[in-house]
Amino acid sequence: MNVLQKQSIAEMKRVLRNKYFVLWSLIMPIAFYYFFTNVVNTNVPDQRAWEAHYLMSMTVFSVMGSSIMTLGIRMVQERSQGWAAFIRLTPLPDHIYLSAQMIGQSVIHVLSITVIFLFGAIINDIALSPFEWMMSGLWILFGALPFLALGTLIGLMRKVETAAGISNVLYMLLALGGGMWMPFEVMPDMMQSIGQWLPSYHFGSGAWELVRGGSPTWKNILILIAYMMLFMLLSKYIRRKQEAV
């Protein structure tokens, strides 16, 4: 446990030194949130409900991007620089190394969630109960798991440029299809039909329900778990194939 703890702390420090983390995980979501709740006239019937809804969307957007891009691209960089090969020569087991990366990233998610929640509470005076704040934060931490697994899958790519391009496209498509940038209900029917099976939609849906006084559905939970298992199995299979070469 000591080794896992030390490696997790090391991973957290490395993430915080990454300028892309600050851009994608904090500056962009906060800027989008401010723009669409204070600058653009959205003509929504209930402005207060919209501000709480969109705060959850942008927090999910932040954590999703951090999981897919920050984690995935960093893993490819480590492989290209020989760091992953060096780790295999040390007594540190692979599963400890991967677990430390995911734990470190999850702790960083707590920071992102806290900063964005505070921004929404201060700028728009979002008035959720302590229980709703806590449950929303916990749900977002849970919902990030399949995206962390997707990040480790992207981390198996050979080139940083390829990983950056693919992760960027995936991130934007998942955000758009999952209803992060606009209410899911106003999206075209075809996009809704596709979006309802995306992990990003079920990630956001659970958070939206919580700020409306409800709770995530079992469908939200099961689909996120299914995607997490799928990405983990694919990652394990590809890693074994690569190690066999």
UniProtKB/Swiss-Prot annotation:
The keyword Lyase does not apply. GO terms for molecular function: ABC-type transporter activity. It is found in: Cell membrane. Its main location: membrane. It is a multi-pass membrane protein. Residues 20-242 form the ABC transmembrane type-2 domain. Pfam families: ABC2_membrane_3. Keywords: Cell membrane, Membrane, Transmembrane, Transmembrane helix, Transport. The chain crosses the membrane at residues 20-40, 53-73, 103-123, 137-157, 164-184, 214-234. The keyword Oxidoreductase does not apply. One of its GO terms (cellular component) is ATP-binding cassette (ABC) transporter complex. Belongs to the ABC-2 integral membrane protein family. This is Putative transport permease YvfS. It comes from Bacillus subtilis (strain 168). The lineage of its organism: Bacteria, Bacillati, Bacillota, Bacilli, Bacillales. The gene is yvfS.
